């Protein structure tokens, strides 16, 4: 991984499973088991200590994801890892399909209306279940449905710009 490469937060350790060092994970990938495809992991403890972990194995077990870290063999070690965040380098993810985007790639893009009114910068995105919403921070915060072609007209990474059909007073 390059020194300044962007990291993507994929999940976190939420507890121990059994007594042999297995961990329960919360995954924000879709599907949730995809977290195991992207390695090595950069893990950051709640205290800020980071390390790189490769060779993590895992499985879907009911409502939990269970993982095995190389060298972790007891419950006490796992309990000390509770709250640890799991990251990967952006380059570990496959290229998105045409007309699909990774949220992280949209963050920090400029947003303006089809009339050229600058609305601000993408702060983050979230899902409502029916569609994604882009949160734009400028003179104020706006939440714009990330829906093509109704509201989002174009995404241009070279120009660092998203063009939307949106009333700037809304």
UniProtKB/Swiss-Prot annotation:
GO molecular function terms attached to this record: ribosome binding
Pfam families per UniProt: PRC_RimM, RimM
Disulfide bonds: none
Keyword Glycoprotein listed: no
GO cellular component: cytoplasm; ribosome
Residue ranges constituting the PRC barrel domain according to the UniProt record: 98-170
Gene Ontology biological process terms, A to Z: ribosomal small subunit biogenesis; rRNA processing
Record key words, sorted: Chaperone, Cytoplasm, Ribosome biogenesis, rRNA processing
Localization of this protein: Cytoplasm
Domain notes: The PRC barrel domain binds ribosomal protein uS19.
Record family assignment: Belongs to the RimM family.
Known function: An accessory protein needed during the final step in the assembly of 30S ribosomal subunit, possibly for assembly of the head region. Essential for efficient processing of 16S rRNA. May be needed both before and after RbfA during the maturation of 16S rRNA. It has affinity for free ribosomal 30S subunits but not for 70S ribosomes.
NCBIfam families the UniProt entry points to: 16S_RimM
Subunit structure: Binds ribosomal protein uS19.
Protein's recorded name: Ribosome maturation factor RimM
Source organism of the structure: Xanthomonas axonopodis pv. citri (strain 306)
């Amino acid at each position: 991984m390059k020194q300044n490469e962007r990291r993507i937060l994929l999940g976190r350790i939420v507890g121990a499973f059994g007594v042999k060092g297995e961990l329960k994970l919360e995954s924000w990938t879709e599907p949730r088991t995809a977290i195991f495809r992207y390695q090595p992991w950069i893990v950051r403890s709640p205290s800020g200590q980071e390390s790189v972990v490769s060779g993590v194995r895992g499985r879907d077990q009911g409502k939990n994801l269970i993982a095995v870290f190389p060298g972790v063999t007891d419950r006490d070690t796992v309990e000390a890892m509770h709250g640890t965040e799991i990251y990967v380098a952006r380059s570990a993810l496959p290229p998105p399909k045409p007309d699909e985007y990774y949220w992280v790639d949209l963050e920090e893009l400029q947003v303006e209306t089809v009339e050229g009114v600058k609305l601000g910068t993408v702060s983050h995105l979230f899902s409502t279940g029916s569609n994604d919403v882009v949160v734009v921070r400028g003179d104020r915060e706006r939440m714009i449905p990330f829906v093509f072609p109704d509201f989002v007209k174009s995404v241009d990474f070279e120009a660092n710009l998203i063009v939307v059909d949106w009333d700037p007073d809304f």
